[in-house]
């Protein structure tokens, strides 16, 4: 009896080892791979078409749309038409922004704007823009001059509006202000001084109200993902972590950190 139990234990151990050996490869086989040979490189127009930041597609799958360093948001219309101007801030002046290609970009940004985050509300066709200097903006279907929706919150100006996302069910807009002390041209100071004055906010297009969901954030960067409708994720650019904030109860929002492998994240 004891000998039989010993053989059974050995067989069980061997089976467990075999499963452990093959499980990683089996799991890896279920992860779809990306064929990079099918990717397409789309050059931006010369001159002022530099510094692409976020990329977005509209509800019909058209695009991509991308903000560039002269303050415009461009739309890709295919190989035949190429890039066209889709939207721009109310203060945008062609002669001082697009045609002033020799002027350093940071010198133009306060006038021309610097669109960083982009996201469409697919139901309405509205494009929401997180402009580093202008604040949260919106433009309707078809583009044109954008409208500034939020440029200050609780009487505190937005100094470094960065990321934006839209809840496609409710239409609520989530956006970040990376620092209350420094603007985009001083982004290195945000990192070097370990600034933690960043904010995560929500704009309600039905009421035009703005709620502050989280304060004292360290350089919230990129788009605060609202796709799960439970947690908003934002990643500081210099830290190997993601910041998660509950989105369904903004007045009771709690922030938590999720350690990550820096090599697997892009912003």
State the predicted function of each range.
Residues 28, 60-97, 140-142:
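Beta-propeller domains
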């Amino acid at each position: 009896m004891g000998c039989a139990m010993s053989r059974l234990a050995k067989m069980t151990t061997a089976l467990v080892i075999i499963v452990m050996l093959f499980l990683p490869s089996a799991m890896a086989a279920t992860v779809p791979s990306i064929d990079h040979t099918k990717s397409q490189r789309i050059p931006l127009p010369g001159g002022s078409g530099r510094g692409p930041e976020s990329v977005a597609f509209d509800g019909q799958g058209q695009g991509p749309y991308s903000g560039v360093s002269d303050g415009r948001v461009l739309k890709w219309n295919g190989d035949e038409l190429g890039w066209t101007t889709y939207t721009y801030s109310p203060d945008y002046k062609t002669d001082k922004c697009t045609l002033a290609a020799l002027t350093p970009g940071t010198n133009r940004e306060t006038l021309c704007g610097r669109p960083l985050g982009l996201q469409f509300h697919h139901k309405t066709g509205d494009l929401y823009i997180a402009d580093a200097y202008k604040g949260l903006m919106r433009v309707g279907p078809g583009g044109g001059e954008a409208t500034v929706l939020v440029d200050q919150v609780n009487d505190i100006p937005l100094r470094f509006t960065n990321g934006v996302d839209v809840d496609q069910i409710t239409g609520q807009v989530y956006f970040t202000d990376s620092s209350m002390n420094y603007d985009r041209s001083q982004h290195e100071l945000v990192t070097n001084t370990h600034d933690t004055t960043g904010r995560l906010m929500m704009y309600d297009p039905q009421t035009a109200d703005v709620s502050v969901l989280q304060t004292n954030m360290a350089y919230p960067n990129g788009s605060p993902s609202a796709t799960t409708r439970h947690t908003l994720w934002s990643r500081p650019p210099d830290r190997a972590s993601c910041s998660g904030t509950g989105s369904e109860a903004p007045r009771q929002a709690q922030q938590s950190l999720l350690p990550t492998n820096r090599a697997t994240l892009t912003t």
